[in-house]
Regions:
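Active-site loop->helix "elbow" adjoining a glycine-rich segment at hydrolase catalytic centers
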Residues: 156, 208-212, 240-243
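Alpha/beta-hydrolase active-site loop
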Residues: 204-225
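Catalytic nucleophile serine of serine hydrolases
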Residues: 238-241, 253, 266
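Substrate-access "cap/lid" subdomains that shape
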Residues: 256, 265-374
């Protein structure tokens, strides 16, 4: 007499209870393979996103362009946000040339933007945003193993406001469409970055913001290869005040060799102060801070940074009254970072000999018109 189990064995099938166990085992094995594959993919991704810089390890994230106002052409990219390239500019470091970022232990989370430089809001109220610990940069690149050229972007904003994480400057499309590593930086602004206070007496830089930009370019030179960028193929790019900064850096001796091409969009290159103009605005800042006339740079270091920005903000209206001084904020000819007016440097052939693309953006002032109409 043949038992049911013998029939199953003869047919090559398993009895119901054994078939169920085999199916469970098969499912468990498939799940384990999937888990291992996922872990391997995650480990590979973590390795790809974890990068060693001269100050320490950083970990980025994968991001997608989430704008919905038009079709998205940029795919997922690797990003590192808020990487410090300089130390805080608060306290004794205020108004001085920037110092490199101090080292840190462990792996720094670089999934969020760093704070912008202290600045007014677009509403032009008394509200001041940002932090003096602002020397951060952001990196965006497509997922590829190839070494890519680099674009370093300097934001505009009349030397008063702006940041690396303005929505239009986040770099998704430039990185993916042009196959570049995109770097955008924060630097000091307004009375904290674009006002030469040497006439007041005390230790300070004539051009803190320009020095910030040079330090950022040095950081890119020393670190960008670890992010898949080519340090020998760097394009410096900026718009409006950022375009003026590009042209200024083309005439700055310490910036020589830090970039190999330049793009200046709508640059107001004439916005450069002489020593006399800077002296006028330094005294005006002291006056608007309601400080004694003989106040020094050290006295200004003791003041709240938001008050310095607010007082500087009110100086803009004074600048509008003086037709020959179109802004109270601008780089200053200082015989060091900016040895001569950039226009004169270009006329005399003293600029860095790199290819330059320069032009004007149509309707650029329409945004300012919108703000004033509000």
């Amino acid at each position: 007499m043949v038992t049911p189990h013998e029939n199953y064995r003869d047919s090559g099938d398993f009895p119901p209870e054994e078939s169920s166990a085999a199916a469970r085992l098969k499912a468990m094995q498939a799940h384990e393979r999937a888990r291992r594959a996922y872990e391997e993919a995650q480990n590979a991704l973590a390795d790809e996103l974890t990068v060693r810089t001269t100050s320490g390890w950083v970990r980025g994230v994968i991001e997608e362009d989430l704008r919905t106002d038009r079709p998205i052409s940029a795919g997922p990219v690797l990003t590192w946000r808020g990487i410090p390239f300089g130390d805080t500019t608060a306290g004794d470091n205020r108004f001085r040339a920037p110092q490199p970022a101090p080292s840190w232990e462990g792996v720094r989370d670089c999934s969020q933007f760093g704070p912008p430089a202290p600045q007014p809001t677009y509403s032009w109220t008394d509200r001041i945003i940002g932090s003096e610990d602002c020397l951060h940069l952001d990196i965006v690149r497509p997922r590829t193993e190839e070494k890519l050229p680099v674009v370093v972007y300097l934001h505009g904003g009349s030397f008063i406001m702006g940041s690396s994480h303005m929505l239009m400057l986040r770099g998704f499309e430039l990185a993916t469409r042009m196959d570049v590593v995109y770097v955008s930086i924060n630097f000091r602004l307004n009375s904290l970055g674009y006002l030469d206070l040497r006439s007041l007496g005390g230790d300070c830089s004539a051009n803190p913001a320009v020095a910030d930009q040079i330090l950022a370019l040095q950081w890119v030179r020393d670190n960008i290869a670890a992010f898949g960028g080519d340090p020998d193929s760097v394009t410096l790019m900026g718009e409006s005040a950022g375009g003026a900064a590009v042209l200024t850096l083309m005439t700055s001796p310490p910036a020589k060799g830090l970039f190999h091409r330049a793009i200046a969009q709508s640059p107001p290159i004439a916005m450069i102060h002489s020593r006399a103009q800077s002296t006028l605005w330094a005294r005006e800042l002291v006056h608007r801070m309601a400080l004694p006339r003989r106040s020094s740079v050290e006295d200004l270091r003791q003041e709240n940074y938001a008050d310095l920005v607010r007082s500087g903000q009110s100086m803009m209206w004074r600048a509008g009254e003086l037709i020959h001084l179109n802004s109270c904020y601008a780089p200053t000819v200082d015989d060091e970072l900016i040895p001569e007016h950039p226009i004169a440097a270009f006329e005399n052939g003293h600029q860095h000999q790199v290819p330059l693309l320069i032009g004007t953006n149509s309707d650029e002032a329409s945004f300012g018109k919108f703000l004033f109409q509000r």
